[in-house]
Amino acid sequence: AMVGLPIIEFPTAWAKSRDEYFDKGLAVRDEFRFEALVGTSLAPHAPYTVSDASFERIRVLADQLDIPVHLHLHETLQEVEDAKRETGARPFARMQKLGLVNDHLIAVHMTQLTDSEIAACAEAGVSVAHCAESNLKLASGFSPAERLRRAGVNVAIGTDGCASNNDLDMFGELRT
């Protein structure tokens, strides 16, 4: 199993501050670090809910601990358009600038990709989690899974979460 250690910039039932997200997440990672069947990943939610400062810390930790970074990225056209308007850059470009586009990255969704972004994923060793049912429910487009695969990107199947997937059924994802 892979347990994602959530990181987000606002309070939830799990943590009240950015530092608490990191502290609690790293405590979970330490608890399971020698378990052969349980891995951990840093799981910043998405570019629009995590600051550059947090992403910089995430990059350092992922490198130091040699653990993946699980990130919802290019989930919808709206996310990409909002980011371009607010920051002047596509979310993927922001992640490149922050040093997160590398072989630690598991990019979830990736429905809005350019050819150059696909090539960059392949070159960097990024993995993509394709969440077909969630993307259908959100009407957000599809990950170009076959183009990614042909480019040499590792493409996996994902479900996303309960808010955007009615059953979290991996076999259903395979049929979609």
Segment roles from a protein language model:
Residues R59-P68, L100-D103, A120-A129, R150-V155:
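Glycine-enriched alpha-helix->loop->beta-strand junction motifs that scaffold or abut catalytic
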Residues L42, H72, A107, C121, ...:
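Divalent metal-coordination and catalytic microenvironments
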Residues A1-T111:
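Metal-coordinating catalytic core of metallo-dependent amide/deamination hydrolases
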Residues L77-A89, E117-A122, A139-L148, N165-T176:
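Histidine/acidic-residue-rich catalytic or RNA/ligand-binding cores of hydrolases
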